[in-house]
Regions:
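Hydrophobic positions within repeat-based interaction scaffolds
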Residues: 1-89
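Charged alpha-helical signal-transmission linkers that cap and connect PAS-family sensory domains
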Residues: 20, 68, 165-166, 170, ...
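… and, occasionally, acidic/histidine-rich disordered N-termini of signaling adaptors
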Residues: 87-288, 341-356
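Conserved acidic
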Residues: 35, 63, 160, 294, ...
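Residues that scaffold the ATP/ADP-binding catalytic core of kinase and kinase-like folds
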Residues: 7, 245, 268, 299-300
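C-terminal catalytic subdomain
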Residues: 222, 279-291, 296-356
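Generic hydrophobic alpha-helical scaffold/packing signal
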Residues: 1, 29-32, 199, 262, ...
C-alpha cells in the first residue's frame, strides 16, 4: 500500500514538473515574442524617424541652396546696379562740368553783350527824361537798344533779332556793329538809308540770298533820328512801329502809331532786296515817344493765360503819361511780372520811353 502511494506521488510530481516546464517554456516564448515585436516596432519607428529626418534634411538643404542661389543672384544684381550707379554718377559729373563750362561761357558772353549796350551815363546824358525796360528771356538776349549822337542828331533804336539766347545774341552783335558802321563810318543820317545799308551788309555777312529759304536770320527794328533843335523825328521801321503821345493843350490826349514796313532787316520778298521807307513827324516839347520789341505784347498770362497784346500796352502808356519816366518804367515792369505770373517768359522784352 505504501509502495502504491509512493508511485502515485511520484507520478503526480512528474506531471506537475512537466506542466511547470511546459508553462515556463510558453512564458519564455511569449516573452521572446514580445521582445521580437518590441524590437520590430522600435526598428519601424526608427526607420520612419530616419525617413522623416532625411525628408526634412532634404527640404532644409534645398531651401539653403535656393537661398544661396538667390543671394548670389542678388549680389550680382547689386554689383550691376552699383556699376550702373557709378557710371551714371560719372556721366552726371561730366554733364555738370559741361553745363558749368557752357554757363560760364554764356555768362562771359553776357558781359560782352552788356558791354556793347549804351552805358547809362551816355543814355541819360542824351535823354535825361527817359527809361529802358530791358528783360532778356535767357542770360543772353536777341533784343538790344542802341543810341548814338552826331551834332544835333540823335539816333536811337529798339531792335529784336531772330530768336533769343545765344543765336539771338550773336545776330544782335552783328546788327549793333552794322548800325554803328552805317552812322559813324558811312555817315548816313536818314533812318531808311541806315536800314537799307544794314540790310545789305547783313545779307553779305550771313551769305543769305532768296534761294536759301531755310535761312531766316533777320531783325525787326524801330529806328528814330531826332533833331534836338527842330524836334523833327525821322523814323523807319522793320515790322516794329512806334507810339507817340502828343501833348496838346485843351485837346483830348491820344496815342498815335507810326507804322513800320512789313518786312524785317535781312529779308527778301519776291526775290528782291527790299527798300525801307522813312516818315517825318514834327514833335513838340514834352511829347512822348515809345519804341519796343514784340516781347511785352506777346507774353502769355492773366487769368486766362492769353497774350498781353498791343492794345493793353497802349492803354497803360496812355493812362500813365503824366507820371515821370522812372515811374512809368516801374509800372510796366510790375504789370509784366503780374501778368506773366508763374508762366514762362516767352521772349526777350524791350520797351523804351523818351520824353522830348
Amino acid at each position: 500500500k505504501d509502495t502504491l502511494y509512493n508511485k502515485d506521488q511520484t507520478s503526480i510530481t512528474a506531471e506537475m514538473q512537466t506542466r511547470f516546464a511546459t508553462e515556463k517554456k510558453q512564458q519564455e516564448n511569449e516573452i521572446l515574442n514580445l521582445q521580437v515585436k518590441s524590437e520590430s516596432f522600435i526598428k519601424t519607428i526608427f526607420i520612419i524617424a530616419a525617413g522623416l529626418l532625411l525628408v526634412i534634411a532634404f527640404f532644409i538643404f534645398r531651401g539653403l541652396r535656393q537661398k544661396q542661389k538667390a543671394n548670389i543672384a542678388l549680389e550680382e544684381k547689386n554689383k550691376i546696379i552699383e556699376e550702373q550707379k557709378q557710371t551714371v554718377e560719372h556721366q552726371k559729373h561730366i554733364v555738370e562740368e559741361q553745363n558749368k563750362d557752357i554757363t560760364d561761357s554764356i555768362r562771359y558772353a553776357e558781359r560782352i553783350q552788356n558791354a556793347i549796350l549804351p552805358p547809362e551815363k551816355q543814355w541819360y546824358s542824351i535823354f535825361p527824361q527817359s527809361f529802358v525796360f530791358y528783360k532778356p528771356k535767357d542770360i543772353l538776349s536777341g533784343d538790344f537798344y542802341w543810341i548814338e549822337q552826331k551834332g544835333d542828331l540823335v539816333f536811337v533804336a529798339a531792335a529784336d533779332c531772330t530768336g533769343h539766347g545765344v543765336p539771338g545774341a550773336l545776330i544782335s552783335i552783328v546788327n549793333y556793329n552794322l548800325l554803328n558802321k552805317a552812322v559813324l563810318e558811312k555817315d548816313l543820317n536818314n533812318p531808311a538809308d541806315i536800314l537799307n545799308y544794314v540790310n545789305h551788309q547783313l545779307t553779305l555777312a550771313l551769305h543769305q540770298t532768296f534761294q536759301e529759304s531755310s535761312v531766316k536770320d533777320g531783325m525787326d527794328i524801330s529806328l528814330c533820328v531826332l533833331n534836338t533843335k527842330t524836334l523833327e523825328l525821322n523814323y523807319s521801321g522793320a515790322n516794329n512801329p512806334i507810339y507817340i503821345i502828343h501833348q496838346i493843350e485843351n485837346a483830348v490826349t491820344r496815342i498815335s502809331e507810326v507804322k513800320a514796313d512789313k518786312f524785317p532787316v535781312g529779308a527778301f520778298v519776291d526775290e528782291q532786296v527790299q527798300s525801307f521807307t522813312s516818315k517825318q513827324i514834327q514833335l513838340q516839347k514834352n511829347d512822348l515817344v515809345y519804341l519796343f520789341s514784340d516781347g511785352f505784347a506777346d507774353q502769355f498770362g492773366g487769368d486766362k493765360g492769353k497774350k498781353f497784346k498791343y492794345k493793353q500796352l497802349k492803354d497803360i502808356l496812355l493812362e500813365n503819361q503824366n507820371l515821370s519816366m522812372i515811374e512809368q518804367r516801374s509800372i510796366l515792369e510790375n504789370k509784366f511780372t503780374n501778368w506773366k505770373g508763374k508762366l514762362e517768359q516767352v521772349d526777350d522784352v524791350l520797351v523804351i520811353g523818351i520824353k522830348v
